[in-house]
């Protein structure tokens, strides 16, 4: 009975968080002040037939796995095929072509789909595009941070919310801007994509590679800022892995620590281990909690009830998550599009 009571209370809390009484219009919260839901590996055809359907889903985060293919010098999108594409992205760059063209395309086509979809939905809620660089960048093959930025900028242009937008000409680092809560409101981010970069599983297991995506892109941001070119950067690197306290201090050189304001780790590790996650909301950092289903009491990783999702959202909002993710692609847009007040 105690568990059921707690569940009911959390569901009620979730409803209260998003309700607006009568005709009152609540002020739009900042991006850093809400908790939303994302879909793990949304590029997989088993989750959505087309990438545009993933964009339709209402989810606030969609994930792409990307390989830097040094043989063809192309960005491949696949879970485990570094030299091929295996995904739901189409060869389509016009709205009329979506939901009908050949799939299994490269990253450029995934971005083309996003640009076409954006024309149909110019006021969509902000969407974080989480890019796992499976084997890391390959600068020697012309597939490094500069080339990634160029591709994203070419395909999506002003629809990307960039690090320079957070700096706003007023702050000398992303850390300083985040601590000042310089994030825009969710309304101001309508029609925008926000790119998050994380190291990949192949990269992490490669004994010959100790210079991972997060550090490489952190160096990239630092150097662009020093050169007066920070406006070229298109993504936010994330500190990967749940930790207690500030994980930047033990992982990065002091010169790049201030360029990390995204953090990404396992929800159960954060919550069940009793970590003090208030650190993230106090500093207005973006905290992505993955595998949200696994927090005790565990729920389905694929198709929990709507009430279970609402309760999990409320619980992890209280634990200071910005976005919670799982494989909940079967849920409706009204569920995946839920927005709660953070912390």
Regions found by a protein language model. Give the residues of each.
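Secretory targeting and sorting signals
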Residues: 1-26
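Catalytic cores of phosphodiester-bond hydrolases, prominently lipid phosphodiesterases
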Residues: 27-343
């Amino acid at each position: 009975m105690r568990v059921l009571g707690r569940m009911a209370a959390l569901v009620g809390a979730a409803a209260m968080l998003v309700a607006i009484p009568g005709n009152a219009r609540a002020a739009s919260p900042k991006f850093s002040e809400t908790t939303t839901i994302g879909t793990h590996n949304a590029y997989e055809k088993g989750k959505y037939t087309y990438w545009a359907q993933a964009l339709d889903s209402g989810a606030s985060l969609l994930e792409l796995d990307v390989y830097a293919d040094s043989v063809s010098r192309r960005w491949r999108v696949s879970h485990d095929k570094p030299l091929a594409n295996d995904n739901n992205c189409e060869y389509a760059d016009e709205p009329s072509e979506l939901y009908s063209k050949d799939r299994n395309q490269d990253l450029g086509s995934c971005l083309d789909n996003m640009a076409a979809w954006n024309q149909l939905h110019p006021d969509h809620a902000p969407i974080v595009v989480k890019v796992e660089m499976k084997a890391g960048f390959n600068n020697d093959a012309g597939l490094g941070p500069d080339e990634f930025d160029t591709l994203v900028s070419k395909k999506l242009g002003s629809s990307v919310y960039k690090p320079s937008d957070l700096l706003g000409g007023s702050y000398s680092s992303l850390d300083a801007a985040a601590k000042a809560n310089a994030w825009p409101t969710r309304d101001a981010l309508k029609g925008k994509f926000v790119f998050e970069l994380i190291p990949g599983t192949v990269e992490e297991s490669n004994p010959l590679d100790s210079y991972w995506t997060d550090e490489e892109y952190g160096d990239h941001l630092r150097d662009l800022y020093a050169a007066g070119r920070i406006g070229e950067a298109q993504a936010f690197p994330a500190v990967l892995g749940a930790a207690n306290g500030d994980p930047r201090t033990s992982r990065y050189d002091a010169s790049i620590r201030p360029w990390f304001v995204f953090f990404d780790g396992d929800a159960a590790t954060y919550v069940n281990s009793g970590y003090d996650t208030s650190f993230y909301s106090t500093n207005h950092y973006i905290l992505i909690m993955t595998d949200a289903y696994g927090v005790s009491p565990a729920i389905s990783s694929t198709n929990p009830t709507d009430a279970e999702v609402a309760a999990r959202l409320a619980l992890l909002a209280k634990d200071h998550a910005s976005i919670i993710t799982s494989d909940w692609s079967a849920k409706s847009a009204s569920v995946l599009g839920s927005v709660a007040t953070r912390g």
